[in-house]
Amino acid sequence: MWRKCLGKVVLLGCALPCVAARISVSPKLGAYGDARGGPDLWGLCIKATDAEEVSGDPDDTEMEYLPPRYAPETPLVGLDVAFRAENGFLLQLTVDAALTRLMFRGQCLAGYSFRPGGG
């Protein structure tokens, strides 16, 4: 359902007379970050060890099962594309991808921009 809505926004943004278009590389290029899963992150996760001891006592059989987690240090790369029309409509798409794992995070910003100065 959101794909249809996003498609209409992109179509509307591209159909308007465009004053500026920007394509830039994210500042995350080559950076290492903590890529733990969130509501806007999808991908294959790294399984934590099946069980880890809660206490240091070897006779203690109580084990703690940890949830799957993403790599603590993952190089990220991103792409940012923005369009601004003459009427002030602004559409910005950002995609970040992890290089060592199949993980992607995307976001879309649609709004209105104001130009300072008189006409």
Swiss-Prot record:
<comment type="similarity">
    <text>To T.pallidum TP_0127, TP_0315 and TP_0619.</text>
</comment>
<protein>
    <recommendedName>
        <fullName>Uncharacterized protein TP_0618</fullName>
    </recommendedName>
</protein>
<dbReference type="InterPro" id="IPR024471">
    <property type="entry name" value="DUF2715"/>
</dbReference>
<dbReference type="Pfam" id="PF10895">
    <property type="entry name" value="DUF2715"/>
</dbReference>
